[in-house]
Amino acid sequence: GGVTETSGSTGPAGRDRRTTDRVARHGLPPAARRVHFVGVGGIGMSGIAEMMSGLGYGVSGSDLTASAVTARLRELGIDVKTGHDARWVSGADAVVVSAAVSDDNSEVVEARRRDLPVIPRGAMLAGLARSRSTVAVTGSHGKSTTSSMVAVVLAECGLDPSAVIGARVAAFGSSTRVGQGPHFVVEADESEPSLLELTPQIAVLTNLEDEHLDHYGTFGRLQDTVARFANRVTETGAVVLCADDPELIRLRERILRRVVTYGLDD
């Protein structure tokens, strides 16, 4: 195997402005101290909740069902309720919502009634990444494994990274790591438009297959989203892609950032 590098032309990364103007440091209003997570039982939401607790925010959450994930959050001192109730928004400065949560959820309705920022999970993750040197990993398969390897290598090198991964990392004992270093490793789900909230320094593309067509409709639209994501990389950054994947090789010509390839045959 090997690694090769090419340079592409640079252009505007483009920015998705869907988040509210009130969103500031860490994607939250400057005075925010307590954040409530609706749908906190998912691996992505729980990881962000755990990270924000580690950063010193007061964190609470709710989910329809109790699980091993919600039990772990409780062990960390996070107040997690089972079911949904408007009362649980009381005291929160902002509310983060899972993609699985509908707009008519009682807690979301109450948050809007109180004029609280209601922040999608992807926007919250992007807010956490904003002040860091971010490595974002996406692809149809291998996201958790690859992002875990990147985070563990950075940690073993003494760089003390933060990470939010879509699976438990044995070396961390969690899907999340809160570090003091500048690096932030995230698993970016290509099935969600929130992929385009991120502006990473490095994007890693593992592979691309015709999945998630229930969301995108066509494989072409999925390809478009991944190409847009790659071009959101900072102009001094790089896109690392697997040269063994034919779809990524075809996508490569649409990438305007510096490209580094890897693979068994590369």
What is each residue range found by the language model?
Residues G1-M124, P246:
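N-terminal leader/targeting and accessory segments in enzymes
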Residues M51-G54, R74, W88, A99-R258:
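Phosphate-binding loop of NTP-binding sites
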